[in-house]
A protein has these predicted regions:
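NTP-binding/hydrolysis catalytic cores, primarily Walker-type P-loop NTPases
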Residues: 76-177
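Conserved P-loop NTPase nucleotide-binding/switch module
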Residues: 1-81
């Protein structure tokens, strides 16, 4: 179901204790989803923002950002991972994105064309988590192969708060583990 309030705290608790959790949340970007979850968790428990951010990024290391475009189509615009580094800082990695290749007005209607692109491979820590939670190595290898087919210059890990990580905006957000 959709997270709208204090149930965000229960969702992250369930996800961090081995339960599969799939939920949606409204926010303005893939990266903003984690901050929105922190805000919702604070409706239930008053904790430091950094502590709550640690909890929600551990519970939901990957967000899937969907948006309704001007032509009324819905697209997955971005899939992003948040990795907590050994020093406690966070790194946001865009894994996949939808790149608009053409935006045109035809017969009074908008038409948007684009392609989904692999951008940056998942972190070693998430790869390990996938395998430990039952992903067959063959599937992980297939996933990782999708990143090897892109140009290295397109890689885009961002440190927390970088401008490049905050450029995507939208009206809908889907978050899943």
């Amino acid at each position: 179901g959709e997270m709208r309030s204090a149930e965000a705290y229960a969702a992250q608790e369930a996800a961090r204790t081995g339960h599969g959790v799939l939920t949606t949340i409204h926010s303005n970007s893939s990266q903003a989803t984690w901050r929105r979850m922190v805000t919702l968790c604070k409706r239930k428990h008053e904790m430091a923002d950094d502590t709550l951010m640690d909890l929600v990024t551990e519970a939901f290391p990957v967000t899937v950002f969907a948006k309704q475009l001007e032509d009324k189509s819905r697209k997955i615009m971005e899939i992003m991972e948040c990795e907590t580094l050994p020093d406690g800082s966070r790194q946001y990695n865009t894994l996949y994105r939808f790149r608009i290749t053409e935006n045109r007005l035809e017969d009074g209607k908008f038409h948007i064309d684009g392609v989904h692109e692999a951008v940056s491979p998942i972190s070693e820590s998430l790869q390990k988590r996938f395998v430990e939670n039952g992903m067959p190595q063959q599937e992980l290898d297939r996933l990782m192969d999708s990143f090897e087919q892109k140009a290295p210059a397109e890689s885009s890990p961002h440190a927390e708060g970088s401008a490049a990580a905050q450029t995507v905006t939208a009206t809908d957000e889907n978050t899943l583990q």
